[in-house]
Amino acid sequence: MRPQILLLLALLTLGLAAQHQDKVPCKMVDKKVSCQVLGLLQVPSVLPPDTETLDLSGNQLRSILASPLGFYTALRHLDLSTNEISFLQPGAFQALTHLEHLSLAHNRLAMATALSAGGLGPLPRVTSLDLSGNSLYSGLLERLLGEAPSLHTLSLAENSLTRLTRHTFRDMPALEQLDLHSNVLMDIEDGAFEGLPRLTHLNLSRNSLTCISDFSLQQLRVLDLSCNSIEAFQTASQPQAEFQLTWLDLRENKLLHFPDLAALPRLIYLNLSNNLIRLPTGPPQDSKGIHAPSEGWSALPLSAPSGNASGRPLSQLLNLDLSYNEIELIPDSFLEHLTSLCFLNLSRNCLRTFEARRLGSLPCLMLLDLSHNALETLELGARALGSLRTLLLQGNALRDLPPYTFANLASLQRLNLQGNRVSPCGGPDEPGPSGCVAFSGITSLRSLSLVDNEIELLRAGAFLHTPLTELDLSSNPGLEVATGALGGLEASLEVLALQGNGLMVLQVDLPCFICLKRLNLAENRLSHLPAWTQAVSLEVLDLRNNSFSLLPGSAMGGLETSLRRLYLQGNPLSCCGNGWLAAQLHQGRVDVDATQDLICRFSSQEEVSLSHVRPEDCEKGGLKNINLIIILTFILVSAILLTTLAACCCVRRQKFNQQYKA
């Protein structure tokens, strides 16, 4: 009898548990439970005991107790982020012996109740811990962190830490990634990271550091120091082993000079943008001539930026960003050792000239950004920059360049010259005036922008034997395009822009460009287009703000199979006579941009939306015109008859009067 009673009690218990479980609004899939944003005030106690992943983020939890959390001993992933947790019961996570990932981000752990709770306690198997966004401050952090021998990733971002000491990261021998971004760190005590022998990734961005005077983390591979107030960066003078650093971010600081990085031979990524850097133009100075850190820092003596240090400094560097600095000149010696460099950004500086004339200079460089400087001269050697594919020169003052400046770049594919004063030469038979630049015969070039260069005449053969796929000649008011100026591009050109040039006549036989997909003729004074009588590849046609009144089917018929988008705003379109356009609108073959706002005019000058025009409207208009013509003809004939009749009567009367007098 007794076993039967026990069995009945067990069944009742299971039934009640199942009933309560059904009431829990959490989503359960296999061993994963999601209780996100449910307004929960405490950890649910009726979840499956074998749950391995529990997401309680976005609720209103204020305290974490050992019970019921300790019931879920199989937990591996626990997300408690974005709650209001300010109390952790001692040993709250002690029963979770399998826990590997714990997130307490964006809570209130800095409140006094968290202090009295004794911190997190030991986390023997946790590999990932997120404590970001808790207003944690120095001193409290040491009391909150417990023993975590397996911890690999720790996030302390978006807190209020001001100082790191030797004791901050104790008992974390396996830590590899440490995120401290967006704190208020001003001081890092010597040896603060000595207890982290496996640390490879360190993020110290968005803090208040002013100097790195004795960098000695040989094992570190990624270091982010961006968005601080760093005035100097110096490695240890006698490191115990070779530095492994490959990625260094120092952007948005206050560096006045290029740091001496000869001790970092493995560096492949270096970002120094948004600083105050000027490169030295003379011989190296002694340490007295170099900017020293602000007072309050016991920095080692700083050496001049070195390009000739032992070995080959920066010889493995692939990416260098020096944009938004105050560089006026690039010394020849600066580029000598950058033999592996692939990407160089020097935009937004004060450069007036750039030279790369030496044989083999920057042999691996693929992208060079010199945009938005004050460049007036550009000298590129015949065998320099042999791998360069992209050259960005927009926003400079280039003019009167050597004619074959770009023809010497054997691998050049993309060239942006927007906002300069470059004048293209003609073809081999029409070279052009002095100071023009040759764009013909550059067999590798695919994309060219000559926007806003004050070009007056585009000569015949300007791009002969240069298989461009994209050409932008916009914003050159008064541009005259000579017959044959785009000759040689018929089989390659896919994108052509001639916007804002004031063109009245287009001397380009567009139907011959069989690969053309996008054509921009906006903001000109065109009223006619050449006839596309055969099928072509054109998909997008921009005719905004021109003088088109009619787009007859005889001229546009060849576009029906390919055209997908047509821009026509700002043209004096006729409501009648545009049968081809109306058919495209009503049948939906072509997407005419903003069709509801596309206005056309009837002969009576009445303006309506083109999408509202029906064929019968034009038929009625035609009937009205015919009736008007008939009426006018009748009135004219009647007037002639009446005039003739009056004249005859007058003659007869005169004859009658003469006979009567006689």
UniProtKB/Swiss-Prot annotation:
Residues 571-620 form the LRRCT domain. One of its GO terms (cellular component) is plasma membrane. It comes from the Eukaryota. Pfam families: LRR_8 (PF13855), LRRNT (PF01462). LRR repeats lie at residues 50-73, 74-95, 98-119, 125-145, 150-171, 174-195, 198-219, 220-240, 244-265, 266-286, 316-339, 340-363, 364-385, 387-408, 411-432, 444-465, 467-488, 492-513, 515-536, 537-558. Residues 1-19 form the signal peptide. Preferentially expressed in regulatory T-cells (Tregs). GO terms for biological process: establishment of protein localization to extracellular region; negative regulation of activated T cell proliferation; negative regulation of cytokine production; negative regulation of transforming growth factor beta receptor signaling pathway; positive regulation of gene expression; secondary palate development; transforming growth factor beta receptor signaling pathway. Residues 20-627 are extracellular. Residues 21-48 form the LRRNT domain. The chain crosses the membrane at residues 628-648. Glycans are attached at N203, N271, N308, N345, N545. Residues 649-662 are cytoplasmic. CDD domains: LRR_RI. It is found in: Cell membrane; Cell surface. One of its GO terms (molecular function) is transforming growth factor beta binding. Keywords: Cell membrane, Disease variant, Disulfide bond, Glycoprotein, Growth factor binding, Intellectual disability, Leucine-rich repeat, Membrane, Repeat, Signal, Transmembrane, Transmembrane helix. The keyword ATP-binding does not apply. Key regulator of transforming growth factor beta (TGFB1, TGFB2 and TGFB3) that controls TGF-beta activation by maintaining it in a latent state during storage in extracellular space. Associates specifically via disulfide bonds with the Latency-associated peptide (LAP), which is the regulatory chain of TGF-beta, and regulates integrin-dependent activation of TGF-beta. Able to outcompete LTBP1 for binding to LAP regulatory chain of TGF-beta. Controls activation of TGF-beta-1 (TGFB1) on the surface of activated regulatory T-cells (Tregs). Interacts with TGFB1; associates via disulfide bonds with the Latency-associated peptide chain (LAP) regulatory chain of TGFB1, leading to regulate activation of TGF-beta-1. Interacts with TGFB2. Interacts with TGFB3; associates via disulfide bonds with the Latency-associated peptide chain (LAP) regulatory chain of TGFB3, leading to regulate activation of TGF-beta-3. Interacts with LAPTM4B; decreases TGFB1 production in regulatory T-cells. This is Transforming growth factor beta activator LRRC32. It comes from Homo sapiens (Human).
